Amino acid sequence: MSSLICFIFLFLFSFITSFTASAQNPFYLYHNCSITTTYSSNSTYSTNLKTLLSSLSSRNASYSTGFQNATAGQAPDMVTGLFLCRGNVSPEVCRSCIALSVNESLSRCPNEREAVFYYEQCMLRYSNRNILSTLNTDGGVFMQNARNPISVKQDRFRDLVLNPMNLAAIEAARSIKRFAVTKFDLNALQSLYGMVQCTPDLTEQDCLDCLQQSINQVTYDKIGGRTFLPSCTSRYDNYEFYNEFNVGTPQDSSPRPGKGGNSSVIVIAVVVPITVLFLLFVAFFSVRRAKRKKTIGAIPLFKVKRKETEVTEPPAETTDGDDITTAGSLQFDFKAIVAATDIFLPINKLGQGGFGEVYKGTFPSGVQVAVKRLSKNSGQGEKEFENEVVVVAKLQHRNLVKLLGYCLEGEEKILVYEFVPNKSLDYFLFDPTMQGQLDWSRRYKIIGGIARGILYLHQDSRLTIIHRDLKAGNILLDADMNPKVADFGMARIFGMDQTEANTRRVVGTYGYMAPEYAMYGKFSMKSDVYSFGVLVLEIVSGMKNSSLDQMDGSISNLVTYTWRLWSNGSPSELVDPSFGDNYQTSEITRCIHIALLCVQEDANDRPTMSAIVQMLTTSSIALAVPRPPGFFLRSKQEQAERACPSMDTSDLFSIDEASITSVAPR
């Protein structure tokens, strides 16, 4: 009986061993031989290649780390090579796979100097070029599962797969092994699994670039797919494929014979298989549960219904937004934002304002957005923040930058805007090498577009919005150089008082601020009108308001300088020299006149934006005589003349004293 019991144990052991061994057999997938360069069988290169392959498949190779590179010979017959095993396989599986790939390499590519071989558990590569620590994405291959996605539209399926795969790519690029897996839900009944891996000798950025290219090459019209590139691989499928081949060879063990009668044999013969099946069942669900906890999760591009594809075509112009817009329909997933901005990589930083930093973000489908990461001293709670975002998102006009949505994650508050490609107006306006791209005709259209955008905020939108920080840096230019006003509504979103006429916290940029706002915190639509006037003068002159400094005993800024030219009857001296003779004097003089009306000290004297738009579009409208501007700065000569009434002066207007270090209104 004991021999029978031993036989049963040996049978079970051999069955399990053979099952495991069969699962471990390296599975060939694909190879690529470069036919551009070859070698002869008896050449030095052939000898060096065999030396290299022997080194990579030796007993002392780095199977425990799953990666090794090597070099053999000297130029011009030098060979460089490497192997890479899947990040979660055991050293035994890695060694077995590399041994097989080395043995088969010379038969698959008998005379080619450069080749790459892909197996389920490993990859082998060699070349006559230096391929070590070098990104290579040429000569890849894409494979697909034969079945179509189940009850999911293709664009939605693509979104569901791309986002977690790109997040896994970021995780892999930041890890030492350059390897990561993920699991995500396709629907309530089905999950998908993903895996990405680079060669560990790549830099973090090269690894991420390679994986993103690999992931984006997939068509995502099947339930599973994989891409092989020389420097990286990616795969997704509807089963947990990355756990099929990660078990090492079992340790040898000999069952001990037991004693007993027929009942013992029957019990053992029945209990052992049942026990084995039960243990396998428990192990399966334990692993499944553990994997569920540690995966980077089911992360659709958005937490709710909105799809990434919906932000690719923002409306050119609408009246007052969409009444069905809700906070939920605008909410982005934080991990999607992190992935789109490459973890807020400094190279993606577009700028920084008073409310936070702005980054360029690119979603896997290629959609680009501007991501504003708000400062953490916002006065809003989450609910209030969401409500204000909904209000601002409804403000849609062709001369306003569209707010696409927001994101909340812990202390993080993020706004997502449409991406405007041509940077801001100040980038072109104040750079002598770029000014030529903005001739007068184009600048005149920009002035009109800005005016229409502000008019919409003041009058045509459902709620009156006062910008409070209108400046050249907040005017973005689209691909056709059309202006789009940015950062409107930030006072509402940031939790600042927008309904009262006074505020203790003044936000904005000095030089653009109206006197009553800068000094006393009093703001109104006329505060924006003042800023618009300063902006028009900058557009006409190509100079910053603050660029004029104390020279030859005079103290000046652009507003003061313009007023003096106007008073002296020589406003044409303000015109940007880059225009040459390509402008209409009457048109440009009218713009200067309108700007001076906007920067008058008394807010009641300034025109409304509605009147300004009419002045710009209808040349027959007579313009009022402008009064002295706010923040008018006196020269030393003017101060002396005012101190000595006996001097012969032309008292055009009354001017209060001010200094360049302590600017004050009249």
Swiss-Prot record:
The protein's name: Putative cysteine-rich receptor-like protein kinase 20
Catalytic activity reported: L-seryl-[protein] + ATP = O-phospho-L-seryl-[protein] + ADP + H(+); L-threonyl-[protein] + ATP = O-phospho-L-threonyl-[protein] + ADP + H(+)
Binding site residues for ATP: 350-358, 372
Expression triggers: By salicylic acid (SA) or by a bacterial pathogen infection.
EC annotation from Swiss-Prot or TrEMBL: 2.7.11.-
Residue span(s) of domain Protein kinase: 344-623
Phosphothreonine: residues carrying this PTM: 509
PTM sites of type Phosphotyrosine: 417, 517
Active-site residue numbers: 469 (proton acceptor)
Keywords: ATP-binding, Glycoprotein, Kinase, Membrane, Nucleotide-binding, Phosphoprotein, Receptor, Repeat, Serine/threonine-protein kinase, Signal, Transferase, Transmembrane, Transmembrane helix
Known glycosylation sites: 32, 42, 60, 69, 103, 262
Origin: domain of life: Eukaryota
Family: Belongs to the protein kinase superfamily. Ser/Thr protein kinase family. CRK subfamily.
Enzyme class: transferase
Topological domain spans for side Cytoplasmic: 286-666
Domain Gnk2-homologous positions: 27-131, 137-241
InterPro entries tied to this protein: GNK2, GNK2_sf, Kinase-like_dom_sf, Prot_kinase_dom, Protein_kinase_ATP_BS, Ser-Thr/Tyr_kinase_cat_dom, Ser/Thr_kinase_AS
Membrane-crossing residue ranges in chain numbering: 265-285
Keyword Metal-binding appears in the UniProt entry: no
Extracellular side: 24-264
Topological category with respect to the lipid bilayer: Single-pass membrane protein
Signal peptide: 1-23
One cellular component (GO) term of this entry: membrane
Subcellular location: Membrane
